[in-house]
Amino acid sequence: METATLVAIFISGLLVSFTGYALYTAFGQPSEQLRDPFEEHGD
């Protein structure tokens, strides 16, 4: 394979991995530990 193809596949894989981790953190099991600033600011 050509170098440019390998670099493109590597960067695409990193982007997909980062997006998956961000979605897991936002909506998965760890999201219960996140604080909600709107709930803390009760009017």
UniProtKB/Swiss-Prot annotation:
The keyword Plastid applies. Keywords: Chloroplast, Membrane, Plastid, Thylakoid, Transmembrane, Transmembrane helix. It is found in: Plastid, Chloroplast thylakoid membrane. One of its GO terms (biological process) is photosynthesis. GO terms for cellular component: chloroplast thylakoid membrane. PANTHER family: PROTEIN PSBN (PTHR35326:SF3). HAMAP family: PSII_PsbN. May play a role in photosystem I and II biogenesis. This is Protein PsbN. It comes from Sagittaria latifolia. The lineage of its organism: Eukaryota, Viridiplantae, Streptophyta, Embryophyta, Tracheophyta. The gene is psbN.
